[in-house]
Design a protein with these regions (language model features):
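Active-site and donor-binding regions of nucleotide-sugar-utilizing enzymes
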Residues: 2-129
Length: 131
C-alpha cells in the first residue's frame, strides 16, 4: 500500500516513525511519503520526506498570525503533494490545526483518512488514579 503521513512536531515524528515501522512489519511492500522529521526519514527514507516539521511548526497565536500566508501556502503544497503521490491512505499524526483541515479536504477527494494520536497524559492518568 501507499501511505502518506503528516506529522508537524517532534512528538508526531516519533509516533509516526514507530507507526511506519509497524506498517512495514505487516506490509513489506509499503511505500511512504510524509511530512515529518528525522525519525520518520530514518524509517521511510529521506527522499520521501516532503517537508520537515521544523519548516511547518508555529507555536502561539502571535506566531500563527504572523505566518498565516506561509501556513496557507504549505497547506496548498501539501494537498498537491498528496494528490501527486496518490496514496491508498492518508495518516494524520496529531497536529490538529493543520491535520483537521487536511482530513476535511482528503475526505472531499475520496482519500481514506486515519487520525493517529497517542494518548495524552491526562488520559493515562484516568487509568492510574485511585479515584
Amino acid at each position: 500500500m501507499r501511505y502518506y503521513l503528516i506529522a508537524g512536531e517532534p512528538s508526531g515524528d516519533l509516533h509516526g516513525a514507530n507507526l511506519m515501522k509497524g506498517l512495514k512489519a505487516h506490509d513489506p511492500e509499503a511505500k511512504f511519503r510524509f511530512w515529518g522529521g528525522d525519525k520518520m526519514a530514518g524509517v521511510g527514507g529521506s527522499g520521501n520526506l516532503a517537508k520537515h516539521y521544523k519548516e511547518t511548526s508555529f507555536f502561539g497565536i502571535v506566531e500563527v498570525i504572523k505566518n498565516l500566508r506561509t501556513i496557507r501556502r504549505q497547506m496548498k503544497e501539501c494537498r498537491q503533494d498528496v494528490e501527486a503521490f496518490a496514496p491508498d491512505v492518508l495518516i494524520l499524526v496529531d497536529y490538529p490545526g493543520f491535520n483537521m483541515k487536511m482530513a476535511r479536504w482528503a475526505k472531499e477527494h475520496g482519500i481514506r483518512v486515519f487520525y493517529y494520536i497517542a494518548p495524552k497524559v491526562w488520559a493515562c492518568l484516568l487509568y492510574t488514579s485511585d479515584a
